[in-house]
């Protein structure tokens, strides 16, 4: 998988007779007589899509997945989207997965899509949401989540291989509940781009397919035919589009073998468990619980939230001005990768919400270089930020003062797409769905499984999700999870004539928010190991002292109007804990041999409690990481292909701590 900080090399395009030509691959993106008609003939008709769509069940649970090997101009996606909305059942959902090693720059994409005015409605939305071209996975949602695009930027084999659970053909088939329904093999000519048509890639494609999965490609070369046949596909040669003599269609019958070199023990995933009903019970009504409830409800699930307090958005999610910003670093780790993916996705989610609700601002935020260590960290990002100025810009003292609206003692890192969101109000919006029921004042002390459903406080559901923050490890089943409580207190002070000029959040040792209702929120204390949210006057003074260091030239009020304390839940590696919950004793038995060789191949999935999931430990960056994590988890529960690479699924897996303990010893 590509490192998030090794930049993508975008497409080098030469326009010839008003057609885009790839200088990297010495080939055209589409011919003068091609474009929409070619896509319709080769991919839509070649996969018999319209007839298949019209026969789909009419419910929200049905997801039809199309995967493509070369995104290019995005025209195949846009045409598929338009036809889906015309021919598919209204409640069915389309998941489109694509990949590009050299994606088009936004300006080139706009120029390409101007050629097809019949796709202008879809093209306008794609252009609006077109991601920052950082390596890895980008997940975009359209039409109220009815159309989703997972766009992977990087090497096609590496990207699709990360969608596999383990890479062993036999075990993969046992574990997989989600498959690609149709493939668009669309890349430059095999003679120009051999990696797009390799045996290794076609083997991965086979492992992501099921019996009856179809393939269509404009190419009819012997290389492609042989690779498809070897991977288990039955080939049919058809007349090609326009002057082209032939094209290929195929359907998946059976895979014969897979390489033993690329197998990965699937300790992060469980064997499939039948769900008789599409009902889910969520313990916890904070941001995590409300986001996962919303994601499941959009998929047609009936959801019940059990919340201990009197309403949602209390506890650690009660901050009325929670700050959204990424943790940017040159250090290449699952943490930085997950933070970047999460920030980009969350930013897209909140921008859409802000079109309809007044619950915050995304006008940027400023991370001040308040000491030498922070300054060095920010300076290390110079080269990367030159390539991706949309994510951040280093600014000097004068620029930081101009951006913030007040006098500041230093420069810093300006993140233009960040800002703040009212978390409690966001929770209310997320659960405003007829499929979501809320039960408040309901303390959960035990969970029970009756061999069919989970039962909590006499309420029964087929799926149970524990999203109750620092209390997530209070149960027998979860007591091995190393969750730590971190208390934080926010102080609210009166705004002054001078302080009201502050336009964006400022972050240093602490942080301060722009005035809202004539007051500023200043925070936050950080008390590790404290699990009770009692208010503390000393923390108010700590926050005020930090505020003075953030902007010493400003006359800040010392009048404390209010204060609030909440408990953050965090893991030892500061990544969230999201996914199926393993049975600790059985897990240690199954994977005991990892102690002698951490990379040993063990042909067993994780022994997990049936249909029991954890969604917790988001720490102080829940606003940033929860949207992506919960969307992935909802897809897993609903039997959909992952929107995250395997490495990141493992990085947030509840089983990672048990595995680490086996390898390193007690």
Curated annotation (Swiss-Prot):
It is found in: Cytoplasm. It comes from the Bacteria. Keywords: Cytoplasm, FAD, Flavoprotein, Methyltransferase, Multifunctional enzyme, Oxidoreductase, S-adenosyl-L-methionine, Transferase, tRNA processing. InterPro entries: FAD-dep_OxRdtase, FAD/NAD-bd_sf, MnmC-like_methylTransf, SAM-dependent_MTases_sf, tRNA_MAMT_biosynth_bifunc_MnmC, tRNA_MNMC2, tRNA_S-uridine_synth_MnmC_C. Its main location: cytoplasm. It catalyses: 5-aminomethyl-2-thiouridine(34) in tRNA + S-adenosyl-L-methionine = 5-methylaminomethyl-2-thiouridine(34) in tRNA + S-adenosyl-L-homocysteine + H(+). Residues 1-253 are annotated as: tRNA (mnm(5)s(2)U34)-methyltransferase. Its cofactor is FAD. The keyword Lipid biosynthesis does not apply. GO terms for biological process: methylation; tRNA wobble base modification. One of its GO terms (molecular function) is flavin adenine dinucleotide binding. Its EC number is 2.1.1.61, 1.5.-.-. Pfam families: DAO, Methyltransf_30. Residues 283-666 are annotated as: FAD-dependent cmnm(5)s(2)U34 oxidoreductase. GO terms for cellular component: cytoplasm. In the N-terminal section; belongs to the methyltransferase superfamily. tRNA (mnm(5)s(2)U34)-methyltransferase family. In the C-terminal section; belongs to the DAO family. Catalyzes the last two steps in the biosynthesis of 5-methylaminomethyl-2-thiouridine (mnm(5)s(2)U) at the wobble position (U34) in tRNA. Catalyzes the FAD-dependent demodification of cmnm(5)s(2)U34 to nm(5)s(2)U34, followed by the transfer of a methyl group from S-adenosyl-L-methionine to nm(5)s(2)U34, to form mnm(5)s(2)U34. This is tRNA 5-methylaminomethyl-2-thiouridine biosynthesis bifunctional protein MnmC. The lineage of its organism: Bacteria, Pseudomonadati, Pseudomonadota, Gammaproteobacteria, Legionellales.
